[in-house]
From Swiss-Prot:
Domain 4Fe-4S ferredoxin-type positions: 4-32, 33-63, 64-93
Organism: Methanocaldococcus jannaschii (strain ATCC 43067 / DSM 2661 / JAL-1 / JCM 10045 / NBRC 100440) (Methanococcus jannaschii)
Amino-acid positions noted as binding [4Fe-4S] cluster 2 in the UniProt annotation, renumbered to this chain: C23, C98, C101, C111
Superkingdom per UniProt: Archaea
Protein name from the UniProt record: Uncharacterized ferredoxin MJ0155
Positions of [4Fe-4S] cluster 4 binding: C54, C73, C76, C79
Pfam family, one: Fer4_11
Source organism phylogeny: Archaea, Methanobacteriati, Methanobacteriota, Methanomada group, Methanococci
UniProt GO MF annotations: 4 iron, 4 sulfur cluster binding; electron transfer activity; metal ion binding; oxidoreductase activity
Length: 151
C-alpha cells in the first residue's frame, strides 16, 4: 500500500512550525491544524467521515485520499463536525484539509520535506499499525516493571 498518513513524533517536534509555514506558502492557507501548539494532520481515513457526511458530495477520493471539490462545497461545516481529529475546517466559505500535496503534484508532502527535525514521517496504514504495536509493547513493558517495583 502507498504511504498516505503523516505521523508526527512529538518527541522530535520543536514546534518550529516549518510544516505549517510551507503548507501556507504552497496552498495559500495552511491545512495543518495546530492544537495546543502541536501540528495535527488529516489521517486520510479509509471510510472518511468528512466524505460520507457531505450533503453535496463535494469530497471525493483521489488515490484513496479525500479531496475537497471547492466548486461544489457549500461550506455547511458538516465535514468539520464529522472529522474525529479536527483536521478539516471551513475558511473563506470552503472546506480545507490536507491532501498530502496531491493537488500540487508533489510526490512527498511539502511539510514532511520541510521538517528539519525529521519529526514527520509519511507512512502506510500497515507501518502505522506496526508503530502503534511497538509503542504499545514499550508502554506495557514499562508498566510491568513499575508494577514489580511496587510489589
Amino acid at each position: 500500500m502507498n504511504p498516505k498518513i503523516i505521523v508526527l513524533n512529538p518527541e522530535k517536534c520543536t514546534k518550529c512550525y516549518d510544516c505549517i509555514n510551507i503548507c501556507k506558502e504552497i496552498h495559500g492557507e495552511s491545512r495543518v491544524r495546530k492544537v495546543d501548539g502541536i501540528p495535527i494532520f488529516c489521517m486520510q481515513c479509509e471510510n472518511a467521515p468528512c466524505k460520507e457526511i457531505c450533503p453535496v458530495d463535494a469530497i471525493y477520493l483521489k488515490d484513496g485520499i479525500p479531496i475537497v471539490d471547492k466548486e461544489r462545497c457549500i461550506a455547511c461545516g458538516m465535514c468539520a463536525i464529522a472529522c474525529p481529529i479536527g483536521a478539516i475546517f471551513i475558511k473563506n466559505r470552503v472546506a480545507h484539509k490536507c491532501t498530502l500535496c496531491l493537488d500540487v503534484d508533489r510526490i512527498t508532502p511539502a511539510c514532511v520535506e520541510a521538517c528539519k527535525d525529521k519529526a514527520l514521517l509519511l507512512v502506510s496504514e500497515e507501518t502505522l499499525d506496526m508503530m502503534k504495536e511497538e509503542k504499545r509493547k514499550k508502554i506495557l513493558k514499562i508498566l510491568r516493571e513499575e508494577a514489580k517495583e511496587n510489589l
